[in-house]
């Protein structure tokens, strides 16, 4: 992962310009992750952003307002629960993948950094608070399985699933064995928490 400041700067600028990230056929995109995860986890991510990352929340809200062809003030005046439902429903659209990706990256890097560090350390990948400059082109199956198992023993399975899907897509790592594990491991299925 790039540095959090870089993510914020690029992500917010991309949202404001409406740039869509490059798509990869094999993995779930950010807008799909938000659509498939449980409503409780999606709301937790949005609540964290609202409470801890106001500039990101506002940029995402602006992107949603533009996508829905309404003024920002219209969404700001809604009750928070209604506004959050609107945000989450809108972020599942493909044209808002950058906004969804920024929301997920901020939540992962700022709130789930311990999980990121645990995963990378288990794989023997040098990192700084879960941020990596260069990823290996591949990792061995036994090492990957052990790293994923250690995450599942320590963190909520759906949170692990979101991280691993985002990791494989956003970092362009695209490790085939991680993709296979995400598809076959029942504990890594999204939406299980309700």
Where does each model-flagged region fall?
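Compositionally biased, intrinsically disordered low-complexity segments
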Residues: 13, 18, 22, 48, ...
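Hydrophobic membrane-targeting and insertion signals
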Residues: 2-20, 27-36, 181-182
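Generic low-complexity segments that are intrinsically disordered, proline-rich and/or Lys/Arg-biased
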Residues: 3-5, 32, 40, 56, ...
């Amino acid at each position: 992962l790039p540095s959090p400041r870089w993510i914020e700067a690029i992500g917010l600028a991309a949202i404001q310009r409406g740039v869509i990230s490059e798509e990869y056929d094999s993995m779930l995109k950010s807008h799909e992750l938000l659509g498939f995860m449980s409503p409780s986890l999606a709301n937790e991510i949005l609540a964290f952003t609202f409470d801890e990352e106001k500039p990101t929340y506002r940029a995402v809200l602006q992107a949603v307002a533009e996508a829905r062809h309404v003024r920002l003030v219209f969404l700001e005046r809604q009750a928070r629960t209604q506004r959050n439902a609107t945000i989450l429903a809108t972020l599942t659209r493909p044209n808002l993948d950058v906004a969804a990706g920024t929301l997920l990256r901020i939540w992962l890097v700022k709130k789930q950094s311990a999980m990121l560090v645990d995963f990378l350390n288990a794989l023997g990948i040098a990192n700084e608070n879960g941020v990596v400059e260069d990823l290996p082109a591949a990792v061995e199956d036994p090492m990957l399985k052990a790293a994923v198992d250690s995450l599942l023993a320590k963190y909520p399975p759906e949170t692990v699933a979101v991280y691993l899907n985002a990791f494989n897509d956003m970092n362009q790592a695209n490790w085939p064995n991680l993709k296979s594990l995400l598809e076959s491991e029942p504990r890594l299925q999204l939406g299980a928490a309700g």
